[in-house]
Amino acid sequence: MKYKIEKNTVQETLILPLYSRKLCTELYPNLYRDETAVHLIDQIDYDFSEAEENSRSLMQRFGALEVAMRQNDLAWEVRNYLKTHPSAAVVNLGCGLDNTGRACDNGRCKIYNLDFPDVIALRQQLLPAGEREQNIPCDLKDPAWFDKIDASGGAVLFASGVFYYFLTRQVRDLVQGMADAFPGGVLVFDAANRTAVKMIAKTWLRTAKIKDVGAYFAVSDAKSELSPWDSRLQVSSRGYMMGYNDLKDPSVSGFFRFLAKIGDNGMKMQIVKIGFGDRQ
């Protein structure tokens, strides 16, 4: 039986990124594979005709490449942390229907998927928690969820496309709280500069009726801007389109590589990595 998704619901906002990940898998098979997205799309009763039509446009295809690179970069950082902390907590912040935690599973880590209760309710139906995995309903801004994470073997926390919707002070408070709760842990997330965040905001601020885009989290130089938040933070960043992959694949045109350079250098689209001190 297929799971029906209605238009203009919270669930619909989860379906479109899922469709994007399926599109990435089809367009850039050598660069990205998300079998979960392909499988889930088949289980869902939803009118994808508009998404399918949009998928033919040049910018939609480049957007799919952006999604692919972001997910790959974050997964690379998760796997890299697990090499030295094999029993770590792998924490997907604002998980939606993303399965990166399970894709990085080494057979020993503990996987936590966090999102709002209505999102987790849908996830439980479509992606029920597996072995060593928990789906946790929460508000990321409320630190009560810290206590639900077993970080005795370390913690790698990651957020994909989440912090654009946070105020700068909310991200700072969350990062400082994580530094207390997860010493020796790492937080990895995507970010962009003010110009890019304003472009992202155009699509959702209208409906949210929020005027002050400037209060929302944006970063140009991660190390110099975020390090002063707390002396325990070790901040680094890489471009998220080409910082981990040169994109020299037949599926990626020269024009898309050119756009990727503009994204990384002009828009400062980046993967930010924050280490919370060292676990002795």
Question: PLM features: what roles do these ranges have?
Answer:
Residues 1-91, 95-138, 151-152:
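Rossmann-like AdoMet
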Residues 143-152:
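Short amphipathic alpha-helix with an adjacent loop that forms part of the alpha/beta core around
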Residues 157-158:
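A conserved beta-strand element that flanks and buttresses the S-adenosyl-L-methionine
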Residues 165-178:
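A short, conserved alpha-helix within the catalytic core of class I
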Residues 178-194:
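Conserved beta-strand signature within the Rossmann-like core of class I S-adenosyl-L-methionine
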Residues 198-213:
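Short, glycine-/aromatic-enriched active-site segment of Class I SAM-dependent methyltransferases
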Residues 213-240:
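Short alpha-helix
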Residues 232-258:
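Conserved catalytic loop of SAM-dependent methyltransferase domains
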